A protein has these predicted regions:
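Amphipathic alpha-helical interface elements
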Residues: 1-182
């Protein structure tokens, strides 16, 4: 990262973060086609940096501090990616946003400038996201099926009712066991 200019650094950190959040969400979500479609592909509802930040925070996958840092990075990224003008991380509004970032929790040296601050802060954050994603997988902390079916009221002949209920129970059992197999 040290060889990148300011724009390259910001865009790279944002792209790495967006990708890491997408992987975190996929690791956490049920392992099915619908989950992948939420994250990947054209017009995916959770395909943007902003939506991934909000989804991870609302699901409890990132802390409030991490959420705030990612939102700051997103705002800084937008300034660099939506402008052809010569802008800098030393510009007053961008500099204030960088100063508002949390300090790296794995580096004991105080950053010398805004370039080092954002690089170290977001690099630390990316490591934390990677570790959390790994722990979700290792400790089987994936989302679990909580939906259920309800059998209310009966009509028709007794034998038909019993057979219908048995089919429903078997279907529920299959739903639950197929999900359990995916998390092992």
């Amino acid at each position: 990262l040290d060889s990148l200019d300011e724009r390259g650094l910001i865009l790279s950190l944002a792209a790495f973060s967006e990708d890491a959040l997408g992987k975190m969400l996929l690791t956490f979500m049920l392992d099915n086609k619908a989950s992948k479609e939420l994250i990947e592909g054209f017009n995916a509802p959770l395909g943007t940096f902003s939506s991934r930040i909000k989804a991870c925070f609302s699901l409890g996958l990132i802390t409030e501090g991490q959420y705030k840092d990612l939102e700051l990075l997103r705002k800084i990224r937008n300034k660099f990616s939506h402008s052809w003008e010569n802008i800098s991380i030393e510009d007053q509004d961008i500099s204030q946003q960088i100063k508002a970032l949390s300090f790296s929790r794995i580096d004991f040296e105080c950053p010398k400038d805004n370039y080092q601050k954002i690089k170290k802060s977001i690099s630390c954050l990316l490591i934390e996201i990677k570790i959390t994603t790994s722990q979700i997988k290792k400790k089987h902390l994936k989302a679990r099926l909580v939906g259920s079916n309800v059998n209310i009221g009966f009509s028709g002949k007794y034998e038909e009712q019993v057979n219908d209920i048995k089919k429903n129970i078997e279907s529920i059992k299959n739903d639950l066991t197929s999900h359990d197999k995916n998390i092992k």
